[in-house]
From Swiss-Prot:
Pathway: Glycolipid biosynthesis; lipid IV(A) biosynthesis; lipid IV(A) from (3R)-3-hydroxytetradecanoyl-[acyl-carrier-protein] and UDP-N-acetyl-alpha-D-glucosamine: step 4/6. This is UDP-2,3-diacylglucosamine hydrolase. It catalyses: UDP-2-N,3-O-bis[(3R)-3-hydroxytetradecanoyl]-alpha-D-glucosamine + H2O = 2-N,3-O-bis[(3R)-3-hydroxytetradecanoyl]-alpha-D-glucosaminyl 1-phosphate + UMP + 2 H(+). Mn(2+) 1 binds at D9, H11, D42, H198. Hydrolyzes the pyrophosphate bond of UDP-2,3-diacylglucosamine to yield 2,3-diacylglucosamine 1-phosphate (lipid X) and UMP by catalyzing the attack of water at the alpha-P atom. Involved in the biosynthesis of lipid A, a phosphorylated glycolipid that anchors the lipopolysaccharide to the outer membrane of the cell. Mn(2+) 2 binds at D42, N80, H115, H196. It is found in: Cell inner membrane. The gene is lpxH. Its cofactor is Mn(2+). Substrate binds at N80, R81, D123, S161, K165, K168, H196. Signal peptide: none annotated.
Length: 234
């Protein structure tokens, strides 16, 4: 039976090698059973430019490339941690970059997919930050800084993000349900798949909509399998 896999929020980094091991294991086993793989953001814990080189980046690049060479396409939507992943890296591993919101047809079902950070509209501070860092001129300026400087800036942003989370309520950092319904109506879909919140679940509100939230990776991998039979986490 044909199936499509969705993953997100792996937050791969040199500091957590077990996550890279999980990713390699997934790519060399389960991923080979899919006809398509979608990565909905935050594959990396941070990304400072396609010119950075490391053992981690090379491993990920090789795993995605090997999958695409086997005829299994891989699609990527930027997350809030790796929004600077560019075409150079994507092309090097045969991966296709998708826009913030993308409609896909999954076995007769029209589905909207996204990372999910744009759905958290109650987190005003984050949305203001996102608006700033999405400016092309600022991205261009950042990417032309020396690698060492970019690394320091990225580390400061990560630390600030951790600090900010301790002062925010769980509700503020979750999706705004009214905005979710608005987006789904705008794209004329009744199924949405996203990540970002790390709250793996399948929310069903028939006959209106189904919202599937991908989980983050920790001790185990979180993979959503979609087939003609429906949706399930494996």
């Amino acid at each position: 039976m044909k199936k499509t896999f969705f993953i997100a929020d792996l937050h791969l980094s040199e500091n957590r090698p077990h996550l890279t091991e999980l990713f390699v294991q997934f790519m060399q086993t389960q991923a080979l059973q899919a006809e398509k793989l979608y990565i909905l953001g935050d594959l990396f814990d941070f990304w400072i430019g396609d010119d950075e080189q490391s053992a981690l980046i090379e491993t990920v690049q090789q795993q995605i490339l090997q999958l695409s060479q086997k005829g299994i396409p891989c699609y990527f939507i930027h997350g809030n941690r790796d929004f600077l992943v560019g075409r150079h890296f994507a092309n090097s591993c045969g991966m296709e970059l998708l826009p913030t919101y993308q409609i896909v047809n999954l076995y007769g079902k029209k589905v909207l997919i996204c990372h999910g950070d744009t759905l958290c509209t109650d987190d005003l501070a984050y949305q203001q930050y996102r608006k700033k860092v999405q400016q092309k001129w600022l991205q261009w300026l950042f990417l032309h800084l020396p690698l060492k400087v970019r690394l320091k800036i990225a580390e400061k942003i990560r630390q600030k993000s951790k600090t900010d989370k301790t002062h925010k309520s769980i509700e503020i950092m979750d999706v705004n349900k009214d905005f979710v319904e608005q987006i789904m109506q705008q794209f004329q879909v009744n199924i949405l798949i996203h990540g970002h919140t790390h709250k793996q679940n399948i929310h069903q509100n028939p006959p209106h909509f189904t919202r599937i939230v991908l989980g983050d990776w920790g001790a185990t991998a979180s993979v959503l399998e979609v087939s003609a039979n429906g949706f399930q986490f494996i």
